[in-house]
Structure formats: structure tokens, C-alpha cells
Amino acid sequence: MGAKRAATAYAWAAFLNKGVTLAFGTDYPVEPVTPFRGLYAAVTRKSENGKQDYFPEQKLTMDQAIAAYTTGSAFAEFEEKEKGKLVPGMMADFVVLDRDVTAASPEKVLAAKVLRTVVGGKTVYEAK
């Protein structure tokens, strides 16, 4: 890729500063379906092992990264009036986690577990 092009790859903070709506997802089936690795990378700009640092000036806050996975992804699907937020009248698609990822360290976010998944207001997964 080269250093010049690498400097503009995944320039999340620069995009937000220009008013761009970020939409995050996973690259499943190439990568694990979990968003926790993406959250970690967005807020630390490091690989999962913490050894590589990719342009730290592009770090996001956890709230910004979560918004990219929720409201941003709904916007990218042209469904921001139907999903992406937990408000009356919108689809209730959400997960219940074993920790508050907005208060946890990025390393603890990597270890988060899904306790329940709700799609359209109905539980479709519950941890044993």
C-alpha cells in the first residue's frame, strides 16, 4: 500500500470532522462476525495484540465507534428511520452484553460476551 496511501486508510476521525457518516460492520466470513475487534481498533488504532499502532490521530471515542455500528450502518442501508436507535416505533434490534463497553477499557471490550440478541423486539439468542 505504501506509506502515503496508508496514511489515508481508515481515516475515521478525519471523515467525522468533515461531516461524513461512518458505517461500520464486519468482514464476515473473512473475519469473525464480532464487532468487538472493530470497536477496539477504532478507539485504539492498534491491532488486537496491541503491537501495531495505525495513525493514532484517527482514534474515535467509544461512543463514536458504537454510532458507526448502529446509526451509521442504518443510514448506509437507507433505513435510519426504521433502525439504528432504540426509540418507540423503530425496530428493536440490539444485544445485551456482559459489560458496559462505554465504560470498559478497550482491552476489556475485546473480551465482551453477548448475553442476549434481540431482533425486531424478539429474543433470538440467549446465552446459557
What are these regions (language model features)?
Residues M1-E107, A112-G120:
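His/Asp/Glu-enriched, well-ordered alpha-helical/loop segment
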